[in-house]
Design a protein with these regions (language model features):
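Residue-level signal for inorganic ion chemistry
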Residues: 90, 94, 125, 136, ...
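Short aromatic-enriched loop/helix-cap "lid" or pocket-rim segments at secondary-structure transitions
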Residues: 158-163, 258-261, 301, 343
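DPxDG-like acidic metal-binding loop motif
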Residues: 194-201, 209-284, 290
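Secondary-structure edge/capping motif, primarily at the C-terminal ends of alpha-helices
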Residues: 97-105
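Short polybasic amphipathic segments
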Residues: 293-300
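Oxyanion/phosphate-interacting regions
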Residues: 2-18, 30, 34-92, 99, ...
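N-terminal assembly/interaction segments in proteins that build large macromolecular machines
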Residues: 107-212
Length: 453
């Protein structure tokens, strides 16, 4: 069993920076305390400081960050530490690309492309995939790093893709040069176009029931990304068919849950009218968890505060709400991705009264893990197959935060059968609480035969 060992500086610094305090708070009351694992600080001696590797960060407070979880069986400290750092770097790239898209929307067509399924793909999708691939391979040189990821290099490698490839290479190098700020090694020289293509191609694993591999969705919710709304960078590690850790980067996730109901353009407008105090946390975070630890964690994005400082992660837990009348349920924004009419019928049958929270990407999983919503339901139309990269990281984070995620038949999601969630029973249901989850599963059984899905 692990232990929570954070320095006394944590609560004070968190409050000063605007990050939710670690102390009692009405928003967090009634949640279960499960002190089993945590990021912890460890003193770094003068003799050891010079020998710290690039992947080990010594902060200004003479501490380095370590992952302390012995509740989950195998020790994944090295993988967890690296994954959180890598996702922090990826978030920086995404924010820069999104800001560029929003500032010059008239030129966005040159940086947003449509895939065969008509979903958009951007410089950020390829850039993040290249960065994550390079950083993981560099951090685990002693291993044969295997990665399952969403994008390929076909468009970039085509005769018409030269200008787009140049933009991707520039974005990648601009971020990798800052890798040491995150406790990671940067390349000795800038990556060439060939290097970037090779990094993207390295993410060609097909998963399966054996072995260890990373699962990456470089920009989950690309439509939300190009619209200036919610999106996520999702990285998970799967070993022998089980998701063992997950990291979600949510660059636009707001401090106040009420802002999830509004498009980010209103958030940006309000931020311009009444900007938050300098150095305070108002949006953007990374959430992470390891299977079996019984805890999930959240910390603000690094760039807001400068150099990476691990003194202010805080535990996140699911909501304690059980009454459907008070529960908030999430569903995808796009009707093509899920049946809004079916979920509306289910919501009515189980007594949900609030309007659905329609959010892009795995931010829906993040909302449940943080206690900002209680239910996520997705029922794709016939013929659609869910991919593992759209769910792996979010599932383990909700589970370790105290929630439940299954298919609509109440069975665990199976990540051992390749890139798709094969054998999925009708849809996916994630809940903060087991009884609420069972009510929805029962309602699906009662309503399914009359649906048109």
């Amino acid at each position: 069993m692990g232990s929570l060992r954070l320095s006394p500086w944590t609560a004070t610094a968190s409050a000063q920076r605007g990050f939710p305090s670690a102390g009692p708070d009405p928003e967090w009351s009634g949640r279960r305390a499960r002190p089993r694992c945590a990021p912890r600080t460890a003193p770094v001696s003068a003799s050891a400081s010079s020998s710290l590797g690039a992947g080990r960060l010594r902060t200004g407070m003479e501490h380095e960050w370590l992952w302390d979880c012995r509740g989950g069986g195998r020790d994944y400290a090295r993988e967890m530490e690296t994954a959180v750092r890598v996702v922090q770097v990826a978030c920086t790239l995404c924010q820069r690309v999104q800001d560029s898209l929003l500032r010059s929307s008239s030129d966005a067509g040159g940086r947003v492309h449509a895939k065969l399924d008509r979903s958009p793909v951007t410089v950020a999708d390829w850039g993040v995939q290249a960065i994550v691939s390079w950083l993981l391979s560099d951090s685990f040189r002693d291993e044969n790093v295997s990665i399952v990821a969403e994008e390929d290099d076909e468009t970039l490698s085509s005769s018409d893709g030269a200008a787009l490839l140049e933009s991707v290479v520039d974005a990648v190098n601009e971020c990798l040069v800052e890798a040491p700020m995150y406790g990671l090694r940067s390349p000795e020289k800038q990556l060439s176009a060939h290097d970037v293509i090779q990094a993207i191609r390295k993410c060609s694993s097909v998963g399966g029931p054996k072995g260890k591999f990373w699962v990456l969705d470089p920009v989950d919710g690309t439509l939300g990304f190009v619209r200036g709304d919610q999106y996520a960078i999702a990285l998970a590690l799967i070993e022998d068919g089980e998701v063992v850790l997950g990291v979600l980067g949510c660059p636009n996730y707001p401090m106040k849950k009420e802002w999830l109901n509004y498009h980010q353009k209103y958030y940006r407008l309000m931020s311009n009218v009444a900007p938050p105090p300098s150095g305070s946390w108002h949006k953007g975070c990374v959430m992470y968890a390891q299977k079996g630890c019984g805890q999930a964690w959240m910390q603000p994005l690094v760039h807001d505060f400068g150099k990476l400082d691990w003194h202010h992660p805080r535990e996140i837990q699911v909501s304690s709400i059980r009454d459907p009348v008070s529960a908030t349920f999430c569903e995808p924004v796009e009707k093509a991705n899920s049946s809004h009419s079916f979920t509306a019928g289910l919501a009515h049958s189980v007594g949900l009264r609030k309007q659905p929270l329609r959010v892009y990407s795995m931010v829906k999983y993040a909302a449940i893990a943080r206690g900002d919503a209680e239910i996520f339901m997705k029922f794709a139309r016939a013929g659609y197959k869910e991919k593992i990269w759209d769910h792996a990281a979010g599932v383990v984070i909700i589970q370790e935060a105290g929630g439940v995620v299954t298919d609509a038949g109440g069975r665990p999601l199976d990540f051992s059968r390749g890139v798709y969630l094969e054998g999925l029973d009708r849809g996916i249901i994630a809940c903060s609480e087991a009884l609420l989850h069972q009510r929805i599963v029962d309602a699906v059984d009662a309503s399914w035969n009359s649906s048109t899905l």
